[in-house]
């Protein structure tokens, strides 16, 4: 869309942040995997095979789809690996905005936690029932809501370090995005944990039902 609407320049410049797009042709989306949230987001990512660089563009409503047709049945034939990697991507779109070191809004936290609980619950169903329409529908809708800006309200926009790191891995090694994120997040979490252990304790309790202790490190060690 950016390339067609801005023919005077190399579209890669938008991803290098050396130029800013001024237009985009209207886009419609038909998701064939629940993962990226592109069907409702204002961001996009491409890989340049000249150097194997993976970059995201400047977030803009210009490239937000004008309409989306969402049919969970289109996801039935996905391999288990792609289905579960997609679920990780959805979780991470929420978690990148959830794990911030500022005071957040209770309602946004509740929305984010509900999304994460829904994805985890239904991802387990799909391990045994890949053709479960309701589970596919829940995850597809969660994927849209996780990356349309809703879960970033009152969070300062999010951290996004894990996504930036994964883009480097994905560009160099052609790693499935969700799989790369799952490999990175644990190390990132340990690195930032001491900055806000209360946040990790809240996550452990509200998402995984780990009993809450006054000592945050006992809840989320």
Where do the language-model regions lie?
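A glycine/threonine-rich phosphate-anchoring loop and its flanking beta-alpha core
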Residues: 2-104, 202
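Active-site segments that bind and position negatively charged phosphate/pyrophosphate groups
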Residues: 97-220
